[in-house]
Amino acid sequence: MIALRLSKAKILQACVQKQERTIEDFERGIAELKTQLYSQEEIESQEHRPSPERRELLLRMEHELGFLNYEMAVLRQIEAEKPLDVVDLGAVVVTNQRTFFISTSLERVEIEGRTVIGISQKAPIYQVMKGKRAGESFDYGGVRFAILEVY
């Protein structure tokens, strides 16, 4: 199994890059929405005033951007070279079903043709695998996961 091990540094790098792209997309969307809102505010006509829905959308996007930046800070705290043997923040958890990276809720990243699922410490599946080691198992969503390796 060790020979097939994905590099935690590569997994972390892929997660950071995905998060950076997501943040850039949100920043671009927020900038475009602000441009639309503020250019419409300059128009005197009552019928061209920005809708409350657009303002609400802007607030939601700004809130989500704040959360994305928080998740990036979590990723930046992870030490790829730190060895782990229990499921905790920064661990790669290889199971008989999937490979997880305990980090942030990034969903899927592809590394060397393999899928790794990023999950946060708040995810329900993390709660059932937390503190477990290779050789242990857990049940989630009606599926039994056998932990093959933690690093």
Where are these regions (language model features)?
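N-terminal intrinsically disordered, low-complexity, charge/repeat-rich segments that act as generic
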Residues: 1-78
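Non-DNA-binding regulatory cores of transcription-related proteins
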Residues: 81-140, 145
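Conserved hydrophobic positions within beta-strands
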Residues: 147-150
